[in-house]
């Protein structure tokens, strides 16, 4: 593992610990299912990890909420499409 990767790993861990409850609560308010909110919050951090090459450390807060909003929108869209 190179130094840059190790630095991002530390940054990612810090972000997860710092923001996971905010993201989970943001999602839970919008979908009203606490257990599903937990799963979707995990998906937010998976997407952050998948796009780590494009993450700007100064704007990670807004990026996390943008990802969360998009995941919630997708979930709601799929729900109504099934009905």
Q: Where are the predicted features?
A:
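Structural recognition of an alpha-helix C-terminal capping motif at a helix-to-coil junction
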Residues: 39-46, 50, 58-70
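Arg/Lys-rich amphipathic alpha helix in sigma70-family domain 2
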Residues: 69-83
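Short alpha-helical functional segments enriched in proximate histidine and acidic residues
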Residues: 26, 30, 47, 71, ...
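Sigma70-family region 2
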Residues: 4-5, 32, 45-59, 78-80
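Residues within helix-turn-helix
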Residues: 35
